[in-house]
Amino acid sequence: MKVVLISRSDLRGGAAVFTFRLMVALRNNGVDAKMLVVEKLSADRSVMSYANYFQDKLNFLLERFEIFIRNGFSRKTLFHVDTAHYGRDISEHPWIKEADYIILNWMNQGALSLRGVKRILELGKPTIWNLHDMWCLTGICHHAYDCNRYTQDCGHCPLLKSNKYNDLSHRVWLSKSQLYRYENLHFVAVSNWIKEKCRQSNLLSQHPVSVIPNSISLSAYQEPKHEGLNQILQDIEKIRQTQSQILAIAAARLDDPIKGLPLLIVALNIFKRKYQTNIHLLLIGSLRDESWLAKIPNDYTFTGPLNPNEVFAVLHHVDVVLSTSHYESFGGTLIEGMLAGCVPVSFDNGGQRDIISHQQTGYLAQYPSADDFADGIKWALASKISKSVLENTVLSNFGADVVAKKYIKLFDRISHNATTQEGVSR
């Protein structure tokens, strides 16, 4: 069985990392899986870049310019939306030609256009589209926030500051609506929350959507060797000697509005007022505006950006891992934290519900109650959940082999259904 996974990158961004892990997991389970990307960062021979620097740069710039002139020349929302109007046609690539199954992943920003997806679907091969966020079920946005226009046919897009029905979001919505008519296209959501959103979406409400989570594997992490990291770990051990318990929050950009940093600060203030507990917060990731640090009411360490191996190494020294995201498709940092032995605390408003069993393997606070989140921190610090229970919970639900076998079952089901339909048509 030959499978090709398509992604913009193999290692840059959460969706890319999870796609790379899926490829490795499928290979470890006997599937001839390969990965086609624009940006190749790994040395894995099963990953090939189809990049053409000039063409890819031009596609990227053309798409950003199209969005920029339609969103009121706002940089603020420039990367909150994608149109997939520009991208490569890779339907003639040898790996695509050889494939029995094709898996589409995060392929925006000029990597693959909707026309390119159409050309792949025209090959007639079973094609699975993994839904890492809401982009496939909306016109152009990756997260709809409080907008419910995706339950109709978009238009009047708030991210474009549009007062027009036939705006860019509606036109892309129409293109997707035509594309989704192909019977060889199948959708997989990475969480039940994404599937719920699909049921609400006018684009996908009538399409079957399977749920297969992202995977994680202990073997995916390598022992990092970095002097700066060693200093961070030494500092954590010194903090331990002050009897402080250690919390951590990690994100590529901590003050991305979707990550809910203001909510976390409110919750920490409530925690400080209600409970006499020494805590130390680790902030892992970048900050565009470091003035946020002055608003944190307790001791903290700002590590700056760390790579996945370094984040995982740090989490082994943490008691509680936090997420205050307003929207979370899956919650990769939570499962990484649990695998490292951290008790997770998060809101109950997204894919976190697939990860945490409330007050059994973590705490799900009622969104958006900062009070309840503060209580969740207290509960987690007092809990006696063993690290082995947390690790086993992750591996039994999100382990690489578990997830790979779910995909193999999906391949078999698609093949069986196709054979049955052929028999009926005869």
What are these regions (language model features)?
Residues 188, 238-259, 265-268:
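Conserved donor-binding/catalytic core segment of Leloir-type glycosyltransferases
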Residues 193, 215:
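Carbohydrate-associated surface elements
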Residues 285, 290-309, 320:
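Nucleotide-activated donor-binding/catalytic signature segment of Leloir-type glycosyltransferases, i.e.
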Residues 306, 313-318, 407:
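Short alpha-helical donor nucleotide-sugar binding micro-motif in glycosyltransferases
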Residues 326:
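Aromatic "clamp/platform" in nucleotide-sugar-dependent glycosyltransferases that forms part
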Residues 343-346:
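Short hydrophobic beta-strand element within catalytic cores of glycosyltransferases
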Residues 358-359, 363-370, 378-384:
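Conserved acidic donor-binding segment of nucleotide-sugar-dependent glycosyltransferases
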Residues 385-400, 406-409:
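A short, well-ordered alpha-helix in the C-terminal region of glycosyltransferases
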